[in-house]
Amino acid sequence: MCSAPNGRKNRPRSAANIFQIGKSSVRDPERRESTESARRAQRAMDDCRTTVQEFNTLVALHREQVISIGENTTDCPSLRAQMHKTRVKGCAVAQAAYQNLIAISGPEDGEIHPEICRLFIQLQCCLEMYITEMLKSMCLLGVLQLHRKGNDMCPELNMDCRVDESSDVPMLEDRSSSPMDFPQDSWVVCADIENIESDMREMRNLLSKLRETMPLPLKNQDDSSLLNLTPYPLVRQRKRRFSGLCCLVSG
């Protein structure tokens, strides 16, 4: 056994230390994989939260546009175009939010993350409001269509008095709008109503799928129990019914 320069003897490494280093090197990839998996799950959760929030914003915008439609007594093509654009984007974002939420929800009888429960409830409420606002917009456009047809059948005469140079008697000129001026606009409004009806069916089907895929503790609740939520996740056991929910609605 050789002596060290400072007078101490070099001790050989023990077998225990060698084996411990080997275990540590084996665990490092597992820890890195676990950390990366947690990061991916967090990114997926953040993406889902962002998508649901975007859909929430679009529903609020669509509601404001429907209110504006109701405040106008005449048809406004530019407002209808904005409402159509918002509605189409809202349907696409709703589908994306559903797919993102299903991807992170996990098994029905596993541990339920409170944030996932909150997103399920938020998306359900947004879809219900979205369908309601689309129904309102369809009814309002229908009323405008009936109002337009009534005006077409009984147009108000817009008389303009002009003087004929060859006569001393003033002549009345009818400048009322002809019913032939409106068919194109009328057809566009009818097409908008049909598109809204189609989008409503799509969103109703999506709402049905969302309710079917919700975590079981959420399925077993009525609407009044949504106000009594516990802040901790629960693990559902098979063939057992929970009396309370397992998430916070407010973020």
From Swiss-Prot:
The keyword Coiled coil does not apply. The keyword Hydrolase does not apply. A lipid is attached at C246, C247 (S-palmitoyl cysteine). It is a lipid-anchor. Palmitoylated. Undergoes rapid palmitoylation turnover. Palmitoylation regulates the cell membrane and nuclear shuttling and the regulation of GPCR signaling. Upon depalmitoylation, it is targeted from the plasma membrane into the nucleus. GPCR signaling inhibits depalmitoylation and promotes localization to the plasma membrane. This is Regulator of G-protein signaling 7-binding protein B. It comes from the Eukaryota. Keywords: Cell membrane, Cytoplasm, Lipoprotein, Membrane, Nucleus, Palmitate, Signal transduction inhibitor. Its main location: nucleus. GO terms for cellular component: cytoplasm; neuron projection; nucleus; plasma membrane; postsynapse. The gene is rgs7bpb. GO terms for biological process: G protein-coupled receptor signaling pathway; negative regulation of signal transduction. Residues 25-43 have a biased composition (Basic and acidic residues). Belongs to the RGS7BP/RGS9BP family. InterPro entries: RGS7BP/RGS9BP. It is found in: Nucleus; Cytoplasm; Cell membrane. It comes from Danio rerio (Zebrafish). Residues 1-43 are annotated as: Disordered. Regulator of G protein-coupled receptor (GPCR) signaling. Regulatory subunit of the R7-Gbeta5 complexes that acts by controlling the subcellular location of the R7-Gbeta5 complexes. When palmitoylated, it targets the R7-Gbeta5 complexes to the plasma membrane, leading to inhibit G protein alpha subunits. When it is unpalmitoylated, the R7-Gbeta5 complexes undergo a nuclear/cytoplasmic shuttling.
